[in-house]
Curated annotation (Swiss-Prot):
Function: Then it catalyzes the NAD-dependent ring dehydrogenation of precorrin-2 to yield sirohydrochlorin. Finally, it catalyzes the ferrochelation of sirohydrochlorin to yield siroheme.
Species assigned in the record: Salmonella arizonae (strain ATCC BAA-731 / CDC346-86 / RSK2980)
Lineage, broadest ranks: Bacteria, Pseudomonadati, Pseudomonadota, Gammaproteobacteria, Enterobacterales
Record protein name field: Siroheme synthase
Span list, region Uroporphyrinogen-III C-methyltransferase: 216-457
PANTHER family recorded: SIROHEME SYNTHASE, SIROHEME SYNTHASE-RELATED
PROSITE patterns cross-referenced by the UniProt entry: SUMT_1, SUMT_2
Binding site for NAD(+): 22-23, 43-44
Pathway info: Cofactor biosynthesis; adenosylcobalamin biosynthesis; precorrin-2 from uroporphyrinogen III: step 1/1; Cofactor biosynthesis; adenosylcobalamin biosynthesis; sirohydrochlorin from precorrin-2: step 1/1; Porphyrin-containing compound metabolism; siroheme biosynthesis; precorrin-2 from uroporphyrinogen III: step 1/1; Porphyrin-containing compound metabolism; siroheme biosynthesis; siroheme from sirohydrochlorin: step 1/1
Catalytic activities: uroporphyrinogen III + 2 S-adenosyl-L-methionine = precorrin-2 + 2 S-adenosyl-L-homocysteine + H(+); precorrin-2 + NAD(+) = sirohydrochlorin + NADH + 2 H(+); siroheme + 2 H(+) = sirohydrochlorin + Fe(2+)
Residues at which S-adenosyl-L-methionine binds: 225, 301-303, 306, 331-332, 382, 411
Positions of the catalytic residues: 248 (proton acceptor), 270 (proton donor)
Cross-referenced Pfam families: CysG_dimeriser (PF10414), NAD_binding_7 (PF13241), Sirohm_synth_M (PF14824), TP_methylase (PF00590)
């Protein structure tokens, strides 16, 4: 280990930055956030330093580097574009036993500054020891995507409860189990983020009053249409905290590879070699696993509340008193149309969009007269088997037979395939396409030749 990672308490302590440019400004911003009493010494200063000085946030000393400025300091940073000046600052600080950072010269520095993920009071620092700053930045960005923005508020609130937890729970094991359920409670985190004091208090009292082996919870997560990059940050956080993930065939392998490694996985979809699990059985799986105290993620393709039967699953949980929450996903209509160069709305062609299921409840019938109206885009989910009927009904109710249509197979994935044609051909076109696929009907389909971008990459 070439460097010892430490966190310095700099509040109301003197620090010096030598340099007045953009790099010095970035370093100054960090020290000011840490509460340092800051002096900046340079020949010239960019405007931001003058603004800070006018607001009384720091002191500016214009002119060449003055060693005497180091005397009261705990820490210094050399951030000029002159290597000789930076070396001078480093040597002067070293002789006074003051830690000094030299920008872009780790060998000349007595400390280096890491990439920081700030969820105050929780802080995460990432460093490559100065050997690969880009790698450290990329790791920081990955951690930024994983750690919720409101995590700091949760940590702050946890600090306020420590005395109460210590008083109520006698053993270390009990305290550990309490904190484990505290830090994964989405309702509490969201209430803190919303500054909803009433909800925070209610959730807190529930956490303290329920047994430590209480029933678990279910999180309904939309996985998006296929491309793992379209999974939301909150969705990613949930699948990485799950004890068990119940998923269907519309969830891509790339997304399943992001699930916590030691989480149990239960496949409930339909594909070669598997039978479709009835919806009622899926409901019971969610209920049973949550009642064991597990954190259950029900992972669905697209958005769980758009033809995903998410509402039915939650009704079962609600009736049983199981806590639940929902993380929406990018629905297939949005993802597949965007990846196919098909804007769902357009001021010249479509002033509205309709999302329609092609899989009707027994005895159901669609409002074909309104669906056949002009100036709109229709998106049919699960419509391949009904393509001939969709064609027949729309034409019968007045839609032009030459209306452009597109069928998007495996949308947003590297296997995406788009078949174009006219409404009069829809039944035949559907025979060329395999599920999962969407049917898009409307004048906007005619823009595909101009706006298609995904296949060209």
């Amino acid at each position: 280990m070439d460097h010892l990672p430490i966190f310095c308490q700099l509040r109301d302590r003197d620090c010096l930055i030598v340099g007045g440019g953009d790099v010095a400004e970035r370093k100054a911003r960090l020290l000011l956030e840490a509460g340092a009493r800051l002096t900046v010494n340079a020949l010239t200063f960019i405007p931001q330093f003058t603004v800070w000085a006018d607001e009384g946030m720091l002191t500016l000393v214009e002119g060449p580097f003055d060693e005497a400025l180091l005397d009261p300091c705990w820490l210094a940073i050399a951030a000029t574009d002159d290597d000789a000046v930076n070396q001078h600052v480093s040597e002067a600080a070293e002789s006074r036993r003051i830690f000094c950072n030299v920008v872009d010269a780790p060998k000349a520095a007595s400390f280096i500054m890491p990439s920081i993920i700030d969820r105050s009071p929780l802080m995460v620092a990432v460093s490559s020891g100065g050997t690969s700053p880009v790698l450290a930045r990329l790791l920081r960005e990955k951690l930024e995507s994983i750690l919720p923005q409101h995590l700091g508020q949760v940590a702050q609130y946890a600090g306020q409860l420590r005395a109460r937890v210590k008083k109520q729970f006698i053993t270390m094991g009990e305290r550990r189990r309490f904190w484990e359920k505290f830090f994964v409670n989405d309702r509490l985190a969201q209430s803190l983020a919303n500054a909803d004091e009433k909800a925070v208090n209610a959730t807190t009292e529930q956490l303290f009053s329920e047994p430590l082996d209480h029933r678990g919870e279910v999180v309904l997560v939309g996985a998006g249409p296929g491309d793992a990059g379209l999974l939301t940050l909150k969705g990613l956080q949930q699948i990485q905290q799950a004890d068990i993930v119940v998923y269907d065939r519309l969830v891509s392998d790339d997304i399943m590879n992001l699930v916590r490694r030691d989480a149990d996985r239960v496949f409930v979809g339909k594909r070669a070699g598997y039978h479709c699990v009835p919806q009622e059985e899926i409901n019971q799986i969610l209920l049973r696993e949550a009642q064991k105290g597990k954190r259950v993620v029900r992972l669905k393709g697209g958005d769980p509340f758009i033809f995903g039967r998410g509402g039915e699953e939650l009704e079962t949980l609600c009736h049983a008193g199981i806590p639940f929450s929902v993380v929406p996903g990018i629905t297939a209509a949005s993802g597949c149309s965007a990846y196919s160069g098909l804007p769902l709305t357009h001021r010249d062609y479509a002033q509205s969009v309709r999302l329609v299921t092609g899989h009707l409840k027994t005895g159901g019938e669609l409002d074909w007269e309104n669906l056949a109206a002009e100036k709109q885009t229709l998106v049919f989910y699960m419509g391949l088997n009904q393509a001939a009927t969709i064609q027949e009904k729309l034409i019968a109710f007045g839609m032009q037979a030459d209306m452009p249509v597109a069928l998007v197979e495996n949308g947003t994935s590297i296997k995406q395939r788009v078949v174009n044609g006219e409404l009069a051909q829809l039944g035949e076109l559907a025979k060329q396409v395999a599920s999962p696929a969407l049917i898009i009907v409307g004048r906007v389909v005619g823009l595909r030749d101009k706006l298609n971008w995904f296949s060209s990459h």
